[in-house]
Structure formats: structure tokens, C-alpha cells
């Protein structure tokens, strides 16, 4: 078995989507990533909702946001987001990308 590193993927993309502890949002994220994975088979898509969503009621909002921003900053090449006028998290992630020159763009579905 060989070691798997970032070089194994053409791009590592953080998927930003509103969560608000809503199971329907989880299903929508899964649908989006499945479609994107077929369109971009050499990319790795990372969902912070699937990584940290189970902690929604166990950590503060700020702590949860910091965890997701750390994941974004350390693991991913860029962020793609589903535009949302109601999600503080998506807005914070976009602001973070702009401040630290992390490429980000809306997902066009």
C-alpha cells in the first residue's frame, strides 16, 4: 500500500452549505457532493457538516466555526459554497476565504 497525500488529488475542495442542525440540509449536501464527484472524479470534496455536524449541540457556535475554519485552512485548496442569505456560517467562511486569499466560488447547480 502506498501513502495517500494531497498530491493524489487534483484539487481538495471544502463544501460550504448552511446546516442549522437540519437533516434536510445534510441530504442536500450529500446530493451535491455525489454530483460533483461524478463531474470531478480527481477531486476530493470535504463537508464540514459531515465532519463536525454531530457536535452541533455540544460545542459553542464560535468553537464549531473555528473547527470548520481550521479544516478549511489546513486541508483544502479552495472552497465552493451554496449561496445562503440566512447562514452565518457560510458568510463567515466566505469572509475568511477573502481575508486569507483562499479561492472560493459559488456552486452552480
Outline where the language-model segments fall.
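Conserved catalytic or regulatory cores that recognize and/or transform ribose-phosphate-containing ligands
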Residues: 1-109
Amino acid at each position: 500500500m502506498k501513502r495517500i497525500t494531497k498530491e493524489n488529488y487534483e484539487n481538495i475542495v471544502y463544501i460550504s452549505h448552511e446546516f442549522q442542525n437540519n437533516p434536510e440540509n445534510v441530504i442536500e449536501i450529500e446530493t451535491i457532493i455525489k454530483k460533483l464527484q461524478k463531474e470531478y472524479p480527481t477531486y476530493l470534496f470535504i463537508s464540514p457538516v459531515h465532519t463536525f455536524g454531530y457536535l452541533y449541540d455540544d460545542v459553542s457556535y464560535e468553537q464549531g466555526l473555528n473547527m470548520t475554519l481550521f479544516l478549511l485552512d489546513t486541508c483544502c485548496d479552495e472552497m465552493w459554497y451554496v449561496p445562503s442569505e440566512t447562514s452565518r456560517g457560510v458568510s463567515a467562511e466566505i469572509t475568511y476565504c477573502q481575508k486569507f486569499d483562499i479561492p472560493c466560488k459559488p456552486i452552480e447547480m
